[in-house]
């Protein structure tokens, strides 16, 4: 069997250049998979940069990762007063509207308002 190198050269499987690139590729992909955070792109920020971000108070949660991915896909953020409504919240509101109707959505809004005002 033959392999094609990155420079376009065709070589046999037992060529040492094929073995070194295959070993390098598999070790770097395993290292990148285990060291990067969930949702981080390959070649993205390493563990040191993520730890530095965590020390600066950057809160990482599944919802923030999902929001970032949805914004990258084109879902808009919109503003309600001085609050930013994230895409996950918009999708949740649409889901609640479909499942519970307008009355259910108003009930959920009332519960949110009461809980938000009771924290003050």
From Swiss-Prot:
One of its GO terms (cellular component) is membrane. InterPro entries: DUF4605, FAM241_domain. It is a single-pass membrane protein. It is found in: Membrane. Keywords: Membrane, Phosphoprotein, Transmembrane, Transmembrane helix. It holds the Pfam family DUF4605. The chain crosses the membrane at residues 91-111. Belongs to the FAM241 family. This is Protein FAM241B.
